Amino acid sequence: MKLILDSENSHPTTITVKGKEITLLLIESSILIDSSQIAKLFDKKEKTVATKVQKSKLEKYETENIKLLKNYGLMNPDAVKPRPFYDLRLMLEGPAYYYFKKEDETDLIDVIVRVAIGKHREWVHNKNIDKI
């Protein structure tokens, strides 16, 4: 799915999981994550995680707004092409579940989703207040 991102309809946020900061992209209808954040969380090579994610055939969210992603810190400043994003819950309950299960931390999935939903609600609420 193509995303048309601007600073009005998207917002980056970070959550701390296992002492590591994970960056998420909040959009109106979803909470998105890219495979590099899962790799960071489990100290895995990004390519290894990306391959596992690609095999899962999750719906990709892609954007051409490279400048905004770099401003958000969601993209390496030297990168030319942005990574695709995926729905957070589908990522955690799908390809990332393997890593959580391996470390016997599957209960963390629910915690991450709840914290992310809280961040999303706060962003939507604050955004709506700003419009008034």
Indicate residue ranges for each PLM-predicted region.
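An anion-engaging/catalytic patch
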Residues: 1-132
